[in-house]
Amino acid sequence: MSLWVPPPKPPTKLGVYRRLSTTAGVHVSPLQLGAGSIGDKWSKFMGSMDKESSFKLLDAYFDAGGNFIDTANSYQDETSEKFIGEWAEARGIRDQLFIATKFSFDYKRGDNTVTQHILYMGNSHKSMHLSVKASLEKLRTTYIDLLYLHCWDFETSIEEVMRSLHTLVLSGKVLYLGISNTPAWVVSQANQYARDHALTPFVIYQGAWNVMDRDFEREIIPMARYQGMALAPWNALAGGKFRTDAEEERRRITGEQGRKLGPTWERNEKERIVSAALEKVAKEVGTNQVTAVALAYLLHKAPFVFPIIGGRKVEHLLGNIEALDISLSEAQMKELESVVDFDLGFPGRMIGNGSSHGPLMRSAGHLEPPLLLQPHRQSKLN
């Protein structure tokens, strides 16, 4: 009898793990559970969940094979990290999870006992120290798997940021580093500084990206490809605005509505057009989950893509997992991209973005496509 018996078949493809990036060998679920809704302090802003419903969603994700949870020091005025920490401790599964959290924002915004907030904000060594200390306590853990710089502050130097982050890695309090909501040139400079000085570089970039809003593709994706970084799209489902006309009407009738991150919960014309295209492709691939198609689109665009799926309902989570079973044709990808204009801008319009040869190179001869790492091929779980 072999010692190397394969494990049981995972309940869903959340349990078919992928290497995080070419620069990080840890294996994680292909879809992250976004914890922006987990916690009970943001009901007026984007919805919130009590502890029982939070634990139920976390249970559903973990029991489906998921191990990659994304939170932040400031989410739900700190209750997101607190609920996750309490849940993981109660289940005794901390080391089975890959937990990402973030610093930069004022996580004491909702704390009335704090009168001076400036030292809790930004990317300084002081802010970083306070935030990580608090996150470890709230998450009830001795280490953070992935720490993101949440937002570039244009105040703290690259040198201070990278040296301060490296001390956290050396201390064992943080294992991997990520960066979010930051210009591509800053990330490139920061990683080059890290390499030049034997410091820990960033291995993943988190930013806004979906089939409707593709600014991410201009500078961020080419930068990540060159740096060997993974991509973690937030706003992958346009803040919940990708839905069918029938679903929107149902919400209107029942009064359920949806998130109000903008002036209204209802979709605008652009969101309706993209939703219709997603619904058409969904029918072609045999699913009624337009959100799953939107996620599958991102997974088909580049390697090492780990979309963040939020929400508060277990049924929505399970519907989104269907994205891992969807294989989109090149024609379907082009159809989804055709409904909203997208321009690479300068200089991409002139030279391309590295994923294919630009007009200047094509004018000189017939060329084989560039040799690039390809996205994972989606397939059914056997």
Residue ranges and their predicted role:
Residues 1-98, 142, 376-382:
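N-terminal binding-site loop/beta-alpha segment at the start of enzyme catalytic domains
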Residues 2-16, 226, 252-285, 300, ...:
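Terminal-tail/helix-coil boundary detector
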Residues 17, 58, 81, 85, ...:
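Generic structural signal for well-ordered alpha-helices
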Residues 110-215, 219:
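Glycine/proline-rich, positively charged
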